[in-house]
């Protein structure tokens, strides 16, 4: 394991403790095992995109809160792999009412990536550059070809997969309203 896992684990533990949430309660809320969450906090488990989004959603924070120190440049972020998607954080934009995270996505064919609900009010905006993507709410995904854009409320379970045998490339803009 490199320092990235330890850094993510430390930030995760600080956030959980600051909110007064037990390890068991957060694991239950995120839909992951207590041992998995404990391993993340200790920096002994390699976090996947699915797990990080599940925990971030349960805590009501953007993904960047877990993967970047406050004030750090997105250039310091690394690729975060998931079942089908590898995401790279390109930029974070802060406004008084929301945080915007811009990610580059590579989606491998033949696999469906399931993403847990984000915090209430989170929206995702995806633009496809190569390949064809099926993404959006798990019960009604949308399809986009190169040059097309799709958006959806991401506070419900959602999915990402390719249509056809080719890898897809896209950018994803996630808008997370500030939690009061």
Task: Name every feature range the model reports, one short phrase each.
Residues 10-27:
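Short basic helix-loop element that most often maps to the first helix and adjoining turn
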Residues 32-45:
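Recognition helix of helix-turn-helix/homeodomain-like DNA-binding domains
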Residues 49-99:
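A short, N-terminal "cap"/entry segment at the start of jelly-roll beta-barrel domains
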Residues 80-117, 123, 172-178:
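A short glycine-rich, His/Asp/Glu-containing loop-to-beta-strand
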Residues 85, 154-180:
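Ligand-binding loop in jelly-roll beta-barrel domains
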Residues 121-137:
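Glycine- and acidic-residue-biased ligand/ion/polar-headgroup-sensing regions
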Residues 138-155:
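Short acidic-glycine-tyrosine-enriched beta hairpin
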């Amino acid at each position: 394991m490199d320092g990235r896992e330890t850094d993510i684990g430390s930030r995760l533990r600080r956030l959980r403790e600051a909110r007064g949430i037990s390890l068991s309660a957060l694991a239950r809320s995120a839909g992951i095992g207590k041992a998995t969450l404990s391993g993340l906090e200790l920096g002994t488990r390699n976090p996947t995109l699915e797990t990080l989004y599940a925990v971030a959603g349960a805590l009501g924070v953007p993904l960047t809160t877990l993967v970047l120190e406050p004030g750090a440049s997105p250039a310091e972020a690394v690729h975060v792999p998931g079942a089908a998607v590898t995401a790279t954080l390109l930029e974070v934009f802060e406004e008084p009412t929301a945080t915007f995270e811009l990610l580059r996505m590579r989606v491998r064919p033949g696999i469906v990536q399931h993403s847990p609900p984000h915090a209430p009010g989170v929206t995702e905006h995806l633009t496809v550059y190569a390949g064809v993507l099926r993404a959006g709410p798990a019960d009604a995904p949308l399809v986009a070809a190169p040059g097309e854009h799709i958006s959806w409320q991401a506070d419900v379970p959602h999915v990402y997969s390719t249509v056809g045998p080719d890898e897809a490339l896209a950018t994803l803009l996630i808008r997370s309203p500030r939690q009061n």
